[in-house]
């Protein structure tokens, strides 16, 4: 019985490590085609990460359920320490232009940069519904380095 408890404990998602020793980012810049994210402090890149996108990654998000990740200028508008994807930081999609472009359809929302649903899980292909996914270790760093209000530019 004790061995089963140890195995189950080893498989559970460990508590996020909220680091305080990292510099604060003043901006995030993402290039979807390259799957590359850069965290800046002023004009200096202080961290960079690879990421995965939605299941239909090409093009700007137009409506809920299209599997696309938005493109354009947004900002970090919330942080979720209780995310089902380890930790997450919210992106301010949709903005007024996104809502107009969606017309009568819902533009969707709840676009986040987040970790994975299980520890040590690695994805070889795009898998989200439009979010930006990194490893759990990486989202712990990003979560600590960005504040609400940090601007984010997402390029094709």
Question: Model-predicted segments: where are they?
Answer:
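Sec-dependent signal peptide recognition
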Residues: 1-3
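C-terminal motif of bacterial Sec signal peptides marking the signal peptidase cleavage site
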Residues: 8-10
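N-terminal post-signal-peptidase region of extra-cytosolic proteins
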Residues: 14-26, 53-77, 93-96, 136-137
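Exported/periplasmic cell-wall-interacting domains
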Residues: 17, 23, 78-156
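Short, surface-exposed loop/turn motifs at beta-strand boundaries within globular domains
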Residues: 21-23, 30-32, 44, 69, ...
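Post-signal-peptide N-terminal segment of Sec-exported extracytoplasmic proteins
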Residues: 28-55
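Structural motif
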Residues: 34-36, 73, 110
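Short glycine- and Lys/Arg-enriched binding-loop motifs that mark or flank ligand-binding interfaces
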Residues: 50, 61, 68, 111, ...
């Amino acid at each position: 019985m004790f061995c089963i408890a140890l195995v189950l404990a080893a498989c559970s998602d460990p508590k996020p490590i909220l680091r305080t020793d990292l510099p604060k980012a003043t901006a995030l810049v993402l290039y979807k085609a390259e799957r590359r994210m850069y965290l800046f402090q002023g004009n200096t890149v202080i961290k960079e990460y690879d990421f995965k996108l939605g299941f239909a990654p090409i093009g700007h998000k137009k409506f809920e359920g299209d599997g696309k990740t938005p493109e354009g200028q947004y900002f970090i508008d919330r942080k979720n320490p209780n995310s089902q994807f380890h930790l997450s930081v919210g992106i301010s999609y949709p903005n007024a232009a996104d809502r107009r472009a969606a017309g009568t359809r819902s533009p969707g929302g709840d676009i986040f940069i987040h970790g994975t649903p299980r520890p040590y899980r690695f994805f070889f292909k795009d898998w989200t519904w439009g979010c930006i996914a990194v490893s759990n270790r990486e989202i712990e760093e990003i979560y600590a380095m960005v504040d609400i209000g940090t601007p984010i530019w997402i390029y094709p």
